[in-house]
Swiss-Prot record:
Family statement: Belongs to the UDP-glycosyltransferase family.
Protein name: Hydroquinone glucosyltransferase
Assigned keywords, A-Z: Glycosyltransferase, Transferase
Active site: 17 (proton acceptor), 114 (charge relay)
Record EC number: 2.4.1.218
Gene Ontology MF annotations: hydroquinone glucosyltransferase activity
Domain of life (superkingdom): Eukaryota
Reactions performed catalytically: hydroquinone + UDP-alpha-D-glucose = hydroquinone O-beta-D-glucopyranoside + UDP + H(+)
Protein's job: Broad spectrum multifunctional glucosyltransferase. In addition to hydroquinone it accepts at least 45 natural and synthetic phenols as well as two cinnamyl alcohols as substrates. Hydroquinone was however the best substrate. In contrast to this broad acceptor substrate specificity, only pyrimidine nucleotide activated glucose is tolerated as a donor substrate.
Length: 470
């Protein structure tokens, strides 16, 4: 049996959950000499991008794929959060076997799950392994998770129907309509899953959150206040992925950026899981054209049914460029580059020519922007992204959020004005300055004596003591 402390990590489905958890694992291995094994539940073959990502894990980080669970009994319209929770629940016998093997072969100090994975705590408790949560998004959203059981009892109607903003401890007031998606329909199984998970958060011995003190001082202060039964919270971020694949080196888009003036390009991407409707796709294209700004757009095929259309499968089969308005490519020639499906986001955001980012407000994307000091246009699509947009626009004041019309679409003029405002306007200058301050704060948090580095060291010390006392 090896003598280094070992951590088991159980991610829920989705690259957005896996990427920061892997970055966390790398820090434990490289800085604190831990071993990590990912226990990965599945519901079928892994998407190619996820398989490549896992196969590139460094020494000291291993993974085991669990047998696929079946969802044949679920209706076609089951919500994504329900499916994520059930992936864990239905995999528990396999998680148990994997943990049993690790206990026999390693010094297992903790079982770490992510935000919807607390049903795996049953296995940790059975084997007397410390249960922890890695929370991949904001401290604001984590504060809502802790507050939700109380809110559930206090509010009788749908949260979106409460006329005044709701107060989450430590956070700016937020309207119920901007709560995370599964809280929008309290009769749906997805809300029941959310509430079930939230109630189990107090079973954790600690929660690591992918944020840092200067980014979210209010929510973190509220979370770290003494409260009977609330676990300690460790802000260890920003944990972001460094693009290091070979296809980055000769990427056409980086060569194109090299030829553009400094800070002149708006980057547009809706993340690995996001899609907009066909009509919205057209308005976005025409708005970008009207703005007369340079832009680099990761184009994915529109989807009229769901905003998280590519969440479980990053490959996008259709030719997205075929959906563009007629003549669009000719009219924007020379000032735009369209990239189908994938682009090296971290490299693009760190490039000197990139001056703004139109984002779906996924937390990984926001953190990458913060680390590179790039101001934003907030275009939330699903999950907790509306909450993130409120935080960016009203809390941090680093983003514009174009408004949708009565038909639910954000119109081309509104889009053009937002793009011009960010890239050329006074507001854009203010956002850029604030983002520069946050970039410096992020760098300080990750420095040798920074707050996030210290929080990780405190956690590692706790886990080391755990195995030395057993």
């Amino acid at each position: 049996m090896e003598h280094t402390p070992h951590i088991a990590m159980v991610p829920t489905p989705g690259m957005g959950h896996l990427i920061p958890l892997v970055e966390f694992a790398k820090r434990l291995v490289l800085r604190h000499n831990f071993g990590v094994t990912f226990i990965i539940p599945t519901d079928g073959p892994l998407p190619k991008a996820q398989k490549s990502f896992l196969d590139a894990l460094p020494a000291g980080v291993n993974y085991v794929l669990l047998p696929p669970v079946s969802f044949d009994d679920l209706p076609a319209d089951v919500r994504i959060e329900t499916r994520i929770c059930l992936t864990i629940t239905r995999s528990l016998p396999f998680v148990r076997d994997a943990v049993k093997t690790l206990l026999a072969t390693t010094k297992l100090a903790a079982l770490v799950v992510d935000l919807f994975g607390t049903d795996a705590f049953d296995v940790a408790i059975e084997f007397k392994v410390s249960p922890y949560i890695f929370y991949p998004t904001t401290a604001m959203c984590l504060s809502l998770f802790f507050h939700l059981p109380k809110l559930d009892q206090m509010v009788s109607c749908e949260y979106r129907d409460v006329p005044e903003p709701l107060q989450i401890p430590g956070c700016i007031p937020i309207h119920g309509k901007d709560f995370l998606d599964p809280a929008q329909d309290r009769k749906n199984d997805a809300y029941k899953c959310l509430l079930h998970q939230a109630k189990r958060y107090r079973l954790a011995e600690g929660i690591m959150v992918n944020t840092f003190n200067d980014l979210e001082p209010g929510p973190l202060k509220a979370l770290q206040e003494e409260d009977q039964g609330k676990p300690p919270v460790y802000p260890i971020g920003p944990l972001i992925r460094a693009d290091s694949s070979s296809k980055v080196d000769d990427c056409e888009c980086l060569k194109w950026l090299d030829d553009q003036p400094r800070g002149s390009v708006l980057f547009i991407s809706f993340g690995s899981g996001g899609a907009v409707s066909h009509n919205q796709f057209i308005e976005l294209a025409l708005g970008l054209e009207m703005s007369e700004q340079r832009f680099l757009w990761v184009v994915r095929s529109p989807n009229d049914k769901i905003a998280n259309a590519t969440y479980f499968s990053i490959q996008n089969q259709n030719d997205a460029l075929a959906y563009l308005p007629e003549g669009f490519l000719e009219r924007t020639k020379g000032r735009c580059l369209l990239v189908p499906s994938w682009a090296p986001q971290t490299e693009i955001l760190s490039h000197g020519s990139t001056g703004g980012f139109l984002t779906h407000c996924g937390w990984n994307s926001i953190l990458e922007s913060v680390v590179n000091g790039v101001p934003l246009i907030a275009w939330p699509l699903y999950a907790e992204q509306k909450m993130n947009a409120v935080m960016l626009t009203e809390g941090l004041k680093v983003a514009l959020r174009p408004k949708a019309g009565e038909n639910g679409l954000i119109g081309r003029v509104e889009i053009a004005n937002a793009v011009k405002g960010l890239m050329e306007g006074e507001e854009g200058k203010k956002f850029r300055s604030t983002m520069k301050d946050l970039k410096d704060a992020a760098s300080r948090a990750l420095s040798d004596d920074g707050s996030s580095t210290k929080a990780l060291a405190e956690l590692a010390c706790k886990w080391e003591n755990k195995i030395s006392s057993t």
